[in-house]
Curated annotation (Swiss-Prot):
Protein name: Large ribosomal subunit protein uL15
Lineage, top ranks: Bacteria, Bacillati, Cyanobacteriota, Cyanophyceae, Synechococcales
Keyword Transcription listed: no
Keyword match Transcription: no
GO biological process terms, semicolon-separated: translation
Length: 152
C-alpha cells in the first residue's frame, strides 16, 4: 500500500487534546479545577514564589549570611622578598632572627617564606620554612644555598 500526503495519519495517542479546566463536573476538572477548596493556592495569579512562607519571615532571611568564616588548615607565612635580602653581606646566614635584627621582619608569628621578587647578587645561606621555586633558583644561581626548616 502506498502512502500519499492526503492519507497520512498521526499515531494513536500522539495528539492528545488539551485538558479544559472549569468546564463542568463531567470533565473531572470542573468547579475548583483540581486546586482544592479555598486558600491562596486556589486563587488566580498562582503560584506563590519559591521560598514564600505565607508572610512569615522566610528561612533564607532568618538564617545569617555566610561571612567571616575561617579557612580550615590554612598555612600562613611571614613573607620576605629577595629584594630585601640585598642588605646582607656575602656568606651571611639569613633566618628569622637575622631578619628581625636588620628590621626587615617585625614580630614574626608565622613561619618564614621567601618569595622570588627581586635579584640576589651575593652568596647567602638562607634558612626558611618555605621557598618559591623562583626564589630558590635565584639564590642557588647566585651561589647561595637554601635550607628548608621544619614547619612546626
Amino acid at each position: 500500500m502506498t502512502s500519499t500526503l492526503n492519507t497520512l495519519k498521526s499515531n494513536l495517542g500522539s495528539r492528545k487534546k488539551k485538558l479544559r479546566k472549569g468546564r463542568g463536573i463531567a470533565a473531572g476538572q470542573g468547579a475548583s479545577c483540581g486546586f482544592g477548596m479555598r486558600g491562596q493556592k486556589s486563587r488566580s495569579g498562582r503560584p506563590t514564589r519559591p521560598g514564600f512562607e505565607g508572610g512569615q519571615m522566610p528561612l533564607y532571611r532568618r538564617v545569617p549570611k555566610l561571612k567571616h568564616f575561617e579557612i580550615i588548615n590554612q598555612k600562613n607565612y611571614s613573607i620576605v622578598n629577595l629584594s630585601k635580602l640585598s642588605e646582607f653581606k656575602d656568606n651571611e646566614i639569613v633566618n628569622i632572627d637575622s631578619l628581625v635584627k636588620k628590621k626587615l621582619l617585625f614580630k614574626p608569628k608565622f613561619p618564614l617564606k621567601i618569595l622570588g621578587n627581586g635579584v640576589v647578587k651575593v652568596k647567602l645561606k638562607v634558612q626558611a620554612h618555605a621557598f618559591t621555586k623562583v626564589a630558590q633558583e635565584k639564590i642557588e644561581s647566585a651561589g647561595g644555598s637554601c635550607e628548608v626548616l621544619n614547619n612546626k
